[in-house]
């Protein structure tokens, strides 16, 4: 079984595995340290009965069954069945409009929840830091964890209307 890593709301369900490299997948929205964080659970064999977008799930509640679904021709072998898990930030709340403008004629079957619109955070590093903090009886801060990541590039923003900064003021 696959369970929710943290309490949150089901944001998206793809139950048509042929439409994504992720196969069947679920995206959950969590509010952690006062900003939205998403978890993605992919290659699911099946989504638990009754799971719906907008539904609130508690930490540890079963949401699916691990599997090997994908849209690739060769598929995922039984021996390689696994859960593809991501912790993400949403890149652009207007992604669908951007996609239509910049990739005209191409399909976007998942709208806002297209994998290209999710910025991944390494879950292994995050869980390790969280464990270290707990061992030292310290509070873990997701915001601090993200702020401590190496800077890969700097972006000059020419508008005060930059949505990323509005959604994540503590990260800018």
Per-region residue spans from a language model:
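Short glycine-rich beta-strand segments
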Residues: 29-31, 65, 88-90
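Acidic, glycine-rich catalytic/binding loops that coordinate metals and/or anionic ligands
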Residues: 52, 75-172
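Zn2+-dependent peptidoglycan hydrolase active-site motif and core
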Residues: 5-48, 76-82
